[in-house]
């Protein structure tokens, strides 16, 4: 059975675990069609466009 040769330091352990402590904040960008703020890689709910292609028919 494998056994660690040295005790891992607190800073090494905490650095490894720190990735899980970061806040998950959604990234926003401007819609290329209407200029509305949209979460990245999602269809704009105001105009229905994503990457200059219309995917939703929005009735006003």
Curated annotation (Swiss-Prot):
Record GO cellular component, one term: large ribosomal subunit
Protein name per Swiss-Prot or TrEMBL: Large ribosomal subunit protein bL32
Key words of the record: Ribonucleoprotein, Ribosomal protein
Coiled-coil residue windows: none
Family: Belongs to the bacterial ribosomal protein bL32 family.
Single Gene Ontology MF annotation: structural constituent of ribosome
Gene: rpmF
Any Pfam family matching the protein: Ribosomal_L32p
PANTHER family: 50S RIBOSOMAL PROTEIN L32, LARGE RIBOSOMAL SUBUNIT PROTEIN BL32
Source species of the chain: Borreliella afzelii (strain PKo) (Borrelia afzelii)
């Amino acid at each position: 059975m494998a056994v660690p040769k040295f005790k891992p330091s607190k800073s090494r352990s905490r650095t490894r675990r720190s990735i899980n402590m970061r806040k998950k904040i959604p990234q926003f960008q401007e819609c290329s069609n209407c200029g509305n703020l949209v979460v990245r890689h999602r269809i704009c709910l105001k105009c229905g466009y994503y990457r200059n292609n219309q995917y939703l028919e929005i009735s006003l």
